[in-house]
């Protein structure tokens, strides 16, 4: 086949036409021969330059684009690089770059029961456990943005529950305070009043029991002394000399009153006016006598009242009233 191509006549074209004709066998004999020669020369001169520029461009483009067969020593294949990037963004993959350890608070005696999860590195979990802020904290892996969002939502829900509990506690405290003001305060006041009444009755009952218990027993020293004082007061009240002294004081008071009336009559008979008044000496004597008698009367009155009071107390202690019939 190649020999036949080489022995093809010089005037015949690729499709069997003469060189004098066109590409589809058309005749070119009518064109001048002088015009065809310069055109052929220009095409022959421009063809090498165009071919050389295309070769240079293909070499530059081939050097910049990746070819499947051309691999370097420091560059991984594109599918492997894409898979590596996807693994770093995947929160469920061990090679995820967006991960850290947070801490949850638990009971201290339950800390040994916790351990790393299925997608966690035990070594990293142990390192996080050593860096825990307190003995009752455990590390929890948080990888990717979904884990952070889930933890924030959980914290927000827990805070909302705590706020609801606080509102319930405040409402309960308000109700307790209101009930205390309306009910317990009144009950406490009534109980205090009843306590005072019962204390008074218990004291009175204890005094009566003590008197009944000591009846028939010998008196103590204080009781004997009090008895002697009461007997002396009773004797003083019943002493005839005391009555005679009272009669003497009354008589002296009557005499003094008569003396004052006599002085008044004498002043009126002598024509002394009220504007002149009594003499200073007479007024002083009369005033002194009246003051002395008044002091004596007050002293006697005070002694009588004290004796009467002591006698009533003694009578209450030694003659208690009979208990009321039930």
Swiss-Prot record:
Functional description taken from the UniProt entry: Functions as a component of the nuclear pore complex (NPC). NPC components, collectively referred to as nucleoporins (NUPs), can play the role of both NPC structural components and of docking or interaction partners for transiently associated nuclear transport factors. Active directional transport is assured by both, a Phe-Gly (FG) repeat affinity gradient for these transport factors across the NPC and a transport cofactor concentration gradient across the nuclear envelope (GSP1 and GSP2 GTPases associated predominantly with GTP in the nucleus, with GDP in the cytoplasm).
Main subcellular location of this protein, as a coarse class: nucleus
Swiss-Prot/TrEMBL GO biological process terms: mRNA transport; NLS-bearing protein import into nucleus; nuclear pore organization; protein localization to nuclear inner membrane
Location in the cell: Nucleus, Nuclear pore complex; Nucleus membrane
Biased composition (Low complexity): 25-52
Keywords: Coiled coil, Membrane, mRNA transport, Nuclear pore complex, Nucleus, Protein transport, Repeat, Translocation, Transport
Coiled-coil residue windows: 218-239, 280-321
GO cellular component assignments: nuclear membrane; nuclear pore central transport channel
Gene Ontology MF term list: structural constituent of nuclear pore
UniProt domain comment: Contains FG repeats. FG repeats are interaction sites for karyopherins (importins, exportins) and form probably an affinity gradient, guiding the transport proteins unidirectionally with their cargo through the NPC. FG repeat regions are highly flexible and lack ordered secondary structure. The overall conservation of FG repeats regarding exact sequence, spacing, and repeat unit length is limited.
UniProt key word Membrane: yes
Family that this chain belongs to: Belongs to the nucleoporin GLFG family.
Tagged with keyword Flavoprotein: no
InterPro entries assigned: Nup54/Nup57/Nup44, Nup54_alpha-helical_dom
Entry protein name: Nucleoporin NUP57
GLFG repeat residue intervals: 22-25
Disulfide topology: none
Membrane topology (UniProt): Peripheral membrane protein
């Amino acid at each position: 086949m190649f020999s036949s191509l080489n022995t093809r006549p010089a005037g015949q074209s690729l499709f069997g036409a003469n060189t004098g004709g066109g590409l589809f066998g058309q005749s070119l004999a009518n064109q001048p021969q002088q015009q065809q020669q310069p055109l052929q020369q220009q095409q022959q001169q421009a063809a090498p330059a165009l071919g050389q520029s295309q070769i240079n461009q293909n070499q530059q483009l081939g050097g910049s684009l990746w070819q499947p067969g051309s691999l370097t020593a420091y560059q991984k294949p594109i599918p492997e690089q894409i898979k590596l990037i996807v693994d770093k963004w995947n929160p469920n993959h061990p090679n995820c770059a967006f991960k850290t350890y947070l801490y949850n608070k638990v009971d201290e005696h339950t800390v040994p029961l916790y351990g790393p999860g299925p997608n966690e590195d035990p070594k990293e979990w142990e390192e996080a456990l050593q860096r825990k802020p307190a003995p009752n904290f455990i590390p929890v892996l948080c990888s990717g943005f979904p884990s952070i969002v889930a933890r924030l939502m959980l914290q927000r829900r827990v805070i909302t529950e705590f706020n609801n509990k606080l509102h319930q506690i405040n409402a309960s405290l308000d109700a307790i305070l209101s009930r205390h003001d309306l009910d317990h305060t009144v009950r406490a006041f009534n109980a205090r009043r009843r306590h005072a009444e019962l204390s008074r009755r218990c004291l009175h009952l204890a005094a009566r029991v003590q008197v009944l218990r000591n009846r028939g027993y010998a008196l103590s020293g204080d009781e004997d002394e009090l008895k002697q004082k009461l007997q002396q007061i009773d004797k003083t009240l019943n002493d005839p000399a005391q009555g005679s002294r009272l009669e003497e004081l009354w008589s002296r008071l009557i005499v003094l009153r008569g003396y004052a009336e006599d002085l008044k009559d004498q002043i009126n008979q002598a024509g002394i006016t009220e504007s002149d008044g009594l003499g200073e000496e007479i007024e002083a004597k009369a005033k002194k006598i009246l003051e002395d008698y008044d002091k004596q009367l007050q002293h006697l009155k005070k002694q009588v009242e004290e004796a009467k009071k002591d006698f009533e107390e003694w009578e209450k202690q030694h003659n208690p009233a009979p208990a009321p019939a039930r």
